[in-house]
Amino acid sequence: MNRRKETGELSRQQQKSLETKNKIFQAAKRILQKKGYEALSIKNICEEAKVSNGSFYHHFKTKDDLLSYYIEEQPSIDPDLLELPANAKEAEAAIVYVYLNYVHYCRELGVEFMANYYTPKNQSLNPLIRTERPYPIVTVHNYLQKCIDAGILSPRFPLEDITSDIRLIVIGNVFEWCLKNGDADFEGNMRRSLGKYLDAVLCKM
């Protein structure tokens, strides 16, 4: 369930669980911002959040699972609500929109958090070992599949290759933004690089 849904839809127990998750995450975020990923241990997180180890493991499997929770529970766009495009250009615009939404969420979390999240040591980013992929890729994959099934698009490459390429482009843009301490044109770079790639691979049937 998306953490941004109205709390009125949640039971008291679910709301309490959500509050505990947020408390744990805020503690992890403070540690990341002050000391970096190396200092982010479950012990330190629990001490900072003033919760037990058992409470942590009740909600998260690992510290990387904790970080992924807040990346994946961003404000979501239901792919079923994205209208089918009339052509490849409209499909491209919809995909770029999804990732501009992601850019906005990254800004909310801040450069310090994102810089420490996008590290090779965070194995939750490794698509080879993940059981679930981050939300934007899932949305885009499902959206493109609908376009292909409807006969609107005929991509030059397999869908899995395209979503993998998009993931790499997004990671590169996040890294550039973090490297420049937030001074890069995050939105502009994301729009331009994704747009050029999609121009090359999306074809109308």
Predicted region positions:
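Basic, helix-initiating cap at the start of DNA-binding domains
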Residues: 1-35, 42-48
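Short secondary-structure transition hinges
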Residues: 104-141
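Short amphipathic alpha-helical segment with a characteristic S/N-K-E followed by hydrophobic residues
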Residues: 24, 39, 62-67
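Short, basic, alpha-helical segments at the C-terminal edge of helix-turn-helix-like DNA-binding modules
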Residues: 71-78
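All-alpha amphipathic helical-bundle segments outside canonical DNA-binding/catalytic cores
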Residues: 128-133, 149-165, 188
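Hydrophobic alpha-helical connector segments
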Residues: 69, 82-108, 159, 163-166
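Short hydrophobic/aromatic patch on the recognition helix
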Residues: 49-60
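C-terminal peripheral helix-coil segments that are non-catalytic and often amphipathic
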Residues: 1-7, 96-97, 101-104, 138, ...
